[in-house]
Regions:
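S-adenosylmethionine/decaboxylated-SAM
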Residues: 22, 26-33, 45-228
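N-terminal pre-P-loop "Q-motif" helix
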Residues: 38-43
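Rossmann-like AdoMet
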Residues: 1-37
Length: 228
């Protein structure tokens, strides 16, 4: 991709996200996001859009209460072809926050049920790097490959890309949260460092920066050896 094509790809993506402001889905995402999501509305719209248009399955690492999970599920619902949506979430609790919950997994499952997307989502409980979780994801995907990877867990996005990279299709979309943001967010510095290293190595192509600090881009199609 030359510079002009790269610029056009960035512009087309921004234009696509902006166009949803005139669609009913924008209001639905806005209403749901205010109650259940930490990410910016534009990121929810972006997630919906990419889930709707991508080739292949969708893998989300770090669902929390299901803000982006529901956005992706609605995108899958409105897509022309059937797609798998797999989300990894270890659970636990979060206190002293506007989205505080005593039981993250319970809140996630409740939100999926309330929005009518439970049957569209496969939840894998655990941490993305645990061998049994990696194995469960591969079983759920079977022969399918991933066309959209959403990373919003801890700050080690490179570790997750190393583990799941062999399942990414050439040109797979990536949404990586905490690339930027407030100075007191401990996830920002390591996330930005790792993403920039992957961009400089040619593995990732940057296509934008959305919301409060979410990076979006594409996988460059270099197959990594499978991590066992």
């Amino acid at each position: 991709m030359n510079d002009r094509e790269h610029y056009q790809a960035c512009f087309d993506l921004m234009q696509a996200v902006a166009a949803y402001r005139h669609e009913p889905i924008h209001r639905r995402l806005e209403k749901f996001g205010k109650r259940e999501s930490m990410v910016h509305l534009d990121v929810l719209v972006l997630t919906y859009h990419l889930a709707r248009i991508c080739r292949g399955s969708i893998l989300e690492i770090g669902a929390f209460r299901g803000g982006t999970t529901v956005a992706a599920a609605w995108g899958v619902r409105d897509a022309r072809e059937a797609k798998k949506l797999i989300t990894i979430e270890p659970g636990g609790s979060l206190r002293k926050h506007r989205l505080a919950t005593r039981n993250i997994l319970r809140s996630l499952k409740r939100n999926l049920a309330r929005k009518g997307v439970t049957e569209r989502v496969t939840i894998v409980e655990g941490r993305s790097f645990e061998p049994e979780v990696v194995a469960a994801v591969h079983r759920a995907l079977d022969a399918d490959q991933v066309g959209l990877l959403i990373l919003d867990a801890d700050a080690d996005c490179k570790r997750d890309i190393d583990r799941y990279g062999p399942k990414l299709i050439d040109g797979c979309w990536l949404i990586i949260d905490d690339y930027g943001g407030k100075a007191d967010n401990p996830k920002v510095s390591p996330t930005k460092t790792q993403v920039d290293e992957l961009v400089n190595s040619g593995l990732l192509l940057p296509l934008g920066y959305y919301g409060f600090g979410t990076w979006v881009g594409r996988w460059q199609g270099i197959t990594l050896p499978r991590v066992r």
